[in-house]
Amino acid sequence: MSATGRGNKRIFQDDYPTPAWPVHRLLEKVRLPAGTWVEPACGQGNIVKAVNQVKKGVKWVTIDINPEYPADLTGDFTYFDGAILKGLMPAKGLFDVCITNPPYKLAQAFVNQGLRIARYVVMLLRVNFLEGDDRQPWMEENTPSLAVLPNRPSFREFIDPETGKKTSTDACAYG
């Protein structure tokens, strides 16, 4: 689905691989500790690979809903309770960092779950995620830090098999 309503088809389970450069840019702007990180929508591992290219000392726990992906745990991250994650969590009880490019329609649930299980939560989301009256009370209690990527990441660069057309995202700011 396109932000401007041009009719692009949504990819199943919002599976849009994340390019390495926005992750690298984000890590330049945000200081995050080494330790145990969780990637709850890991897909093919693009974010894990990108982080590992520029940061040392990170141990990973990966999760994805799609059983075809090489994740440590398969299932819907937004429904996992502490018991499911406990065996994968560090001894101190929280992951050091939760980082992902969540399915946009589930972004709020991913953020909320991340806040429950990690000391730092990093989400690659369109800036317009912060808009909306329904998020106002949540934002007052959980005011996020924001790093804006001035170059537009494209998470949809693929050829549609039905039309043969290249498609991509069209929002102009990510944070």
Question: What are the functions of these language-model segments?
Answer:
Residues M1-G175:
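Class I S-adenosyl-L-methionine-dependent methyltransferase catalytic core
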